Curated annotation (Swiss-Prot):
Residue ranges of coiled coil: 450-489
Ubl conjugation recorded as keyword: yes
InterPro entries xref list: ARM-type_fold (IPR016024), CCAAT-binding_factor (IPR005612), Noc3_N (IPR011501), Nucleolar_cplx-assoc_3 (IPR016903)
Biased composition (Basic and acidic residues): 52-77
Top-level taxonomy: Eukaryota, Metazoa, Chordata, Craniata, Vertebrata
Protein name: Nucleolar complex protein 3 homolog
Species of provenance: Cricetulus griseus (Chinese hamster)
Length: 800
């Protein structure tokens, strides 16, 4: 039979250290309660003992045996026997009998028993002897000191065997109160010193003093660590222990200060490489003192960084679960601010230390918080992820974040915030193509093959060449300078995950609020999509537009995505995008000044891709129709939108020179212009004129006026009607953003009115008419007299 394996695990040292203060307090209370219960038991026994002695002394003891007396049958006979016993004089008893009775009176446990109610005594001698033996066998307790409690220690084993070890448990001396029973039963009341109540001003002064002391302590520890990190790495633990500040007056503030201080310390003292754990061979080898000191610094840094991240994670988790520990001195309301500081620190570490240990753990913590209900927390996390994407040149950290976000979105069944997917727009994928061109020009040095080395180099030279190549390889790894192939591989894997996420949403969650972010992302990365997916993707986009379930902004995103696809690798495809032109032409009139200007920016991007960049595929009739509709739309939108639309009209008039016929009257051509027709090819736009420009010449915004005059003159590049360089060299989107009134400011600023005409001040009499002036003065100077009012005359006249 195999020995039964003990499944109970030995608690680790970390677990033993984590014993809470509440548990220790409960242990101490239980110990004190046991001591008090032991004392009470002892007092109770002593009280019973004294009472039994008093009763025994006051009563006359009965003899052990009485052969004549049997169990009474009648009450009268018993009373007579009692009278005879009481009448027995003490002179008839021997001295030995009296001494025996006194000795028996001292035995409390013996006298407490009711001897009179014992079983009847028989006359026979054997029976009498058995009764005496029975009493002799009964245990007797004397009035002695209580037994001392023993503590069992670990036994000692020697040749003879196991020797148990014990020790007396220390017991406090208790004064025995023997006066009254009532005094023994009354518990001692502990008189507590009354706490002195402080006023609000005094409390604030005390709190300020405590907080100042804690700040000085934090600053001292942080400065000592920064001055010499390798020697003072142990002080990180002391600083981190202040995260458990228990003073309720300054607990929240001190914890926030410690979190921020530790975050800045780790950003400063962390090396620019990842610290790996040592192997057994490395631990066993002898090293120099400097190397040993560096190893101790790295191990201490990694362990304290790990514990710090665990503390931040626990703070955020407790806040999310809305629970606090019983011993916690921080309220739930204040815990929210503490959790926000913890999230901010995690975001800073995510951006600042993407190369260091536990970066993936930080990503796993940050990504779910991007979808948090708190807007502040969600924005902080999304901004941190965007910063990471923008500054990540290699792509390793971006790939890790993309994997976690994709899995989170899928796990939540695509019910997440759109801001999570909008972070994909900050990926640095396009820069690979630029770097590829530069690297093609400056090609890296290729290593020689074995045959080339053998032909050109001697044996010693080959040996040195091999050592040099090995050194170059190690330096490249140390500097983290990855090759172009490595970057392309990482970026390809990242884009695959991004497109898989986008296509899943297009397929399964077409009515999701994530659709605009998906379409915007597809529009940005459309040039990197495989050509094989273009046909299916365009069909899906057209189906979404025709379904009617999308808002005008979402439908504009579909149009923008479709033309981004067709303007890149899609040029080789024979696809007619006329339906997308029609949809954009139809959607333009849904924009107006009563709505937000977000749609205008998308329209400007679409017009640039659809008309300017595809000028060879755009017909003359289509260009005329769009120019006419853009000028009409400029009348009903905000000034910055009008400037962007007029700038686009100027570009189209330069791109399609024959559109200047719209500046003539509408009597030329055949047919009638149909402004409400949804087909731009058949609306007869050549039969109309841009009369809207005359209305825009009187616009209150000076830049709109300038653009209208410039377009009426035929959009010249030179001359008095030409635009200033600050307007002509900027794109339509840049002008739209530059003159935006989102900040509630007018650009250009409104000039103050400085009229040179002075108002004529009337001196003397206010009224120029003398008769009126005299009449007013007379009535003002008259003394009012009370005259009774009589309306009877008026009533009579009215009746008549």
């Amino acid at each position: 039979m195999k020995a039964r394996r003990n499944k109970k695990q030995v608690p680790s040292f970390r677990k033993l250290i984590k014993t809470s203060k509440v548990k220790l307090e409960y242990k101490l209370k239980n110990k004190q309660f046991k001591q008090q219960s032991t004392i009470k038991k002892y007092r109770k026994e002593q009280r019973k003992l004294r009472q039994a002695v008093k009763d025994a002394v006051s009563k006359k003891p009965f003899p052990l045996e009485d052969p004549k007396s049997k169990r009474p049958v009648k009450g009268m006979e018993r009373e007579e026997e009692d009278e005879e016993d009481q009448a027995l004089p003490l002179d008839m008893m021997d001295d030995d009998d009296l001494q025996l009775m006194k000795d028996l009176g001292q035995k409390a446990s013996f006298l407490t028993r009711d001897l009179s109610s014992s079983e009847p005594v028989h006359i026979k001698k054997r029976k009498h002897e058995s009764v005496i033996d029975k009493y002799e066998k009964m245990p007797r307790t004397l009035q002695t000191a209580p037994e001392k409690e023993l503590i069992h220690l670990l036994p000692i084993k020697d040749k003879s065997g196991i020797i148990p070890q014990t020790r007396e448990k220390p017991v406090t001396d208790i004064q025995q109160e023997e006066e009254d029973e009532e005094e023994l039963e009354v518990e001692e009341e502990v008189v507590e010193n009354p706490i002195q109540e402080l006023t609000i001003e005094e409390h604030l002064i005390v709190r300020k003093k405590k907080l100042q002391e804690k700040k000085i302590q934090i600053a001292t520890l942080a400065s000592s660590i920064l001055s010499d990190p390798e020697s003072n790495i142990k002080k990180l633990k002391e600083l981190r222990s202040m995260l458990m500040e228990q003073d309720p007056d300054v607990a929240v503030t001190v914890r926030k200060l410690v979190i921020i201080s530790l975050m800045e310390l780790f950003k400063d003292i962390t090396p620019s490489y990842k610290i790996r754990p040592l192997t057994e061979a490395e631990k066993s080898t002898k090293i120099r003192k400097e190397t040993q000191k560096l190893r101790e610094f790295e191990e201490g840094l990694v362990s304290q960084y790990k514990f710090y991240l665990e503390n931040l994670e626990q703070i955020v988790k407790d806040w999310k679960q809305r629970k606090l520990k019983k011993s916690n001195v921080v309220s739930l309301k204040a815990y929210k601010g503490l959790a926000e500081v913890a999230v901010k620190s995690l975001c800073e570490l995510l951006v600042a230390l993407p190369h260091f240990n536990f970066h993936n753990n930080i990503i796993v913590l940050i990504v779910p918080l991007m979808n948090d209900g708190s807007k502040l927390v969600s924005e902080m996390c999304c901004e941190a992820v965007k910063k990471l994407f923008k500054q990540d040149k290699l792509g390793q950290a971006s790939l890790g974040v993309i994997k976690v976000i994709s899995g989170f979105v899928k796990g939540r069944n695509y019910e997440v915030r759109p801001e999570m997917l909008k972070t994909f727009l900050c990926l640095r994928i396009k820069e690979v193509e630029v770097k590829k061109d530069t690297e093609d020009i400056n090609k890296p040095k290729k290593f020689m093959t074995f045959k080339e080395k053998r032909k050109t180099l001697s044996r010693m030279q080959r040996k040195w060449k091999k050592a040099e190549e090995k050194l170059e390889r190690e330096l490249r790894e140390a500097e983290a300078s990855e090759s172009t192939e490595r970057k392309l591989k990482l970026h390809t894997e990242t884009l695959n995950i991004v497109f898989v996420t986008y296509f899943r949403i297009l397929k399964k969650a077409q009515r999701s609020p994530l659709l605009p972010a998906v379409l915007e992302g597809l529009a940005k990365f459309a040039h990197l999509i495989n050509v094989e997916f273009f046909d299916d993707l365009l069909v899906v986009l057209h189906t979404l537009i025709e379904s009617g379930d999308l808002s005008y902004q979402e439908s504009l995103h579909c149009v923008q995505t479709a033309f981004h696809i067709l303007s890149g690798q899609g040029d080789v495809l024979n696809i007619d995008p006329m339906k997308f032109y029609t949809h954009l032409y139809k959607t333009l009139f849904k924009l107006h000044a009563g709505a937000t200007n977000d749609g205008i920016e998308i329209v400007l991007h679409c017009l640039d891709v659809m008309l300017s960049k595809r000028r060879k595929q755009v017909s003359h009739q289509r260009a005329l129709a769009f120019i006419k509709r853009l000028c009409t739309l400029a009348l009903q939108v905000l000034p910055n939108s009008s400037i962007g639309l007029l700038a686009t009209t100027r570009i189209l008039m330069h791109t399609f020179p024959r559109t200047d016929l719209l500046l003539d009257n509408e009597s030329q051509g055949s047919g009638v212009f149909l402004p409400e027709l949804e087909e731009p090819e058949y609306c007869n736009a050549q039969n109309t004129a841009l009369w809207e420009l005359h209305a825009l010449r009187r616009h209150y915004h000076p830049v709109v006026q300038r653009f209208a005059v410039h377009l009426l003159a035929g959009a010249p590049s030179e001359g008095s009607e030409a635009l200033k360089p600050e307007l002509s060299r900027r794109s339509a989107v840049e002008l739209f953003e530059a003159y935006s009134m989102a900040a509630m400011t007018f650009n250009p600023p409104v000039e103050p009115s400085n009229s040179k005409k002075k108002d004529k001040l009337l001196q003397g009499d206010s009224f120029l008419n003398e008769d009126l002036n005299q009449l007013i003065k007379r009535y003002c100077n008259e003394v009012t007299t009370e005259i009774p009012l009589d309306f009877t005359k008026c009533l009579k006249t009215s009746v008549q």
